[in-house]
Amino acid sequence: LRLIRCELMKWRRSPVWLAFLFLPILPALLGTLNYMGNLEILQDTWYSLWTQHTLFSCYFFLPVLVGIYSSYLMHLEVEHNNWNKYLSLPISKGEIFLAKFFATLWMIFFCELWICTLFVISGKIIGLIDPIPWQKLLIWCSFGTLGGGVMASIQLLLSLFFQSFALPVGIAFGGGLSGLLFLAKGFGHLWPYALMAYGM
């Protein structure tokens, strides 16, 4: 728990909050515009709007965010030469990795909440009058967080092996795009980068 708290403290005053705040706004905007442009087909109000939001966020923006979170935590140790300090402590490498994993999962969870907030705001702005499906939103976000956790574990490993900040983020973006293909072919449950979309 102490290790996890240490990792969570690294998010304070971190530049990743800019990505956290602004990146989800774009898929929310694109998804809402796409929904408004296809009202004759998308008639299930809140559910249809959610599908359009997640279409853009799960395959393009969320994988990039997970990549940024993971790369940031790992790159921070390289940048400040912290690995030697870590390894001199009476803790295992597995404990260090798990602490970083849970810290990343924490950010993914908050990102899901922010996406839900943007979704509800978008629905209200365009005048959806049906009741907001709060229970379904909770389920979608919970499973989305779990799917994001699988992606985060891979991204943390990639960020551990590649000292470049950008390369793992690029791999995450490519993984998100490939997730669209795997999900379309019915193999979304087998591909780590499709699990977030599969859950949401």
Regions found by a protein language model. Name each.
Residues 1-5, 74-87, 145-168:
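Cytoplasmic juxtamembrane interface segments
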Residues 73-105:
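Helix-loop-helix units of permease transmembrane domains in multi-pass membrane transporters
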Residues 1-24:
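Aromatic- and glycine-rich beta-strand/loop motifs that create alpha-glucan
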Residues 15-17, 92-94, 98, 132-137, ...:
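Membrane-helix interface segments
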Residues 19-24, 162-180:
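Pore- or pathway-lining transmembrane helices of multi-pass membrane proteins that form conduits
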Residues 24-66, 98-162:
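Secretory targeting signals
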Residues 30-50, 169-200:
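Terminal transmembrane helical anchor/hairpin motif
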Residues 74, 83-86, 118, 122, ...:
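Hydrophobic alpha-helical interface/terminus motif in multipass membrane transporters
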